[in-house]
Amino acid sequence: MSSGGLLLLLGLLTLCAELIPVSSRQRHRDCDKPPDKGNCGPVRRAFYYDTRLKTCKAFQYRGCNGNGNHFKTETLCRCECLVYP
């Protein structure tokens, strides 16, 4: 990953952490759903929240008709689905 990409990733993580106070965070409503790859469009890499492992994992998403537990980046998945006590 280039230094620009790393800087962008760091910025997104910081923004996510700063905008949403930990005590008031609620998990995205679809994070508890199983991954659904959808059924149309080209396959692309996306991320889903694995409730058993409590982490975001990559999977192949087909672009439509899946549920809401799919995110373009691991960072977005973590921002939406990880809730800290």
UniProtKB/Swiss-Prot annotation:
Tissue spec: Expressed by the venom gland.
Domain called BPTI/Kunitz inhibitor: residue spans: 31-81
Keywords for this protein: Disulfide bond, Ion channel impairing toxin, Neurotoxin, Potassium channel impairing toxin, Presynaptic neurotoxin, Secreted, Signal, Toxin, Voltage-gated potassium channel impairing toxin
Keyword Signal appears in the UniProt entry: yes
Pfam (any one): Kunitz_BPTI
Gene Ontology CC terms: extracellular space
Family label: Belongs to the venom Kunitz-type family.
Name of the molecule in the record: Kunitz-type serine protease inhibitor homolog beta-bungarotoxin B1 chain, major component
Origin species: Bungarus multicinctus
